[in-house]
Amino acid sequence: MNVLLSPQPLFFPHQHEPSRRSPPRTMSHYTMTSRKRKADDDDNEMSVSPTGSPAINPRQLSRPSKKVRAGIELAGRPLPLPRLLETLDKTQLRAVLQTICERHPDIGHEVMTSAPRPSVNGALEVLGEYQDKLRAAIPFGNSSSEYTYYRVKQPLMALVDALGDFTPQFLPPVEQQTTVSLEYLNHATKIIHDLPDFDSQQYRHHKDGAYDEISRAWALVITEAAKRGGGFHLHNGKWDQVLAKHNQQSGGKLEQAMNAMVNEVGWIGANQNAHGQGSSSDPNSILNQLINGTYGAPVQVGPF
């Protein structure tokens, strides 16, 4: 049997042998341009994730929904209560609150029990406002007592009435601290000193009445202080000297307060004199003069 053999032996490439490279081919400019555009298109397509890709979809942020009142047209309406109160000044707010308390006594009682007690500085601030109004009403130049009185009558009466309302607030038993009571009385007496003096006696009754009321207030505080602490802090605080100066400036219209100081605190100096210590290091102190009854007497000067 004849077997036809090929003139060249058969050659089988090895499995791991790299394939032979084909000879290079020359490409036209048109072919290269079209392939470049196709590659760019492929890149653009790959940059966009397909809808069916398993990539995580971006979370869509929900916008806050606006409260829309369906079926209600925009129309004017009054301010809410908090906004309305913001527009009121102190005077207007006080007037509104006072009107409500007068119409509803139970609300007024609740306000009085809930509001904090006024301090001395707070009371003096209010009294200072009344005092400023009084000073602004005083006419310039030399005016007659009658004209001046009717110019200042309204603010004068308002200030005197305010003094009459504030003074009991700082007296015992409402005020338990003697120092607070004396501090208020000291400043209140100074305010009374600054009230206008009129030539006619018929126009002086406001100031005279204020002196009488403040004198009785001094006497009450001095008496209660003597009961609690024996009056030592009155003497140590030199309130006897303060009161004596007020009495002198008022023209002796604080006589009731001066008598209370002598009767309630005078025994301190008497006891100290009995032990040979003296009521004060200064024999000419006002307290010693009050005790000895020599206050206001002429003082001798020179070697007599």
UniProtKB/Swiss-Prot annotation:
One of its GO terms (molecular function) is proteasome binding. Belongs to the cut8/STS1 family. The keyword Cytoplasm applies. Residues 1-66 are annotated as: Disordered. Pfam families: Cut8 (PF08559). InterPro entries: Cut8/Sts1_fam (IPR013868), Cut8/Sts1_sf (IPR038422). Keywords: Cytoplasm, Nucleus, Protein transport, Transport. Binds the proteasome. This is Tethering factor for nuclear proteasome STS1. The keyword Transmembrane helix does not apply. Its main location: cytoplasm. It comes from Sordaria macrospora (strain ATCC MYA-333 / DSM 997 / K(L3346) / K-hell). Residues 46-63 have a biased composition (Polar residues). GO terms for cellular component: cytoplasm; nuclear membrane. GO terms for biological process: nuclear protein quality control by the ubiquitin-proteasome system; proteasome localization; protein transport. Transmembrane segments: none annotated. It is found in: Cytoplasm; Nucleus. It comes from the Eukaryota. Involved in ubiquitin-mediated protein degradation. Regulatory factor in the ubiquitin/proteasome pathway that controls the turnover of proteasome substrates. Targets proteasomes to the nucleus and facilitates the degradation of nuclear proteins.
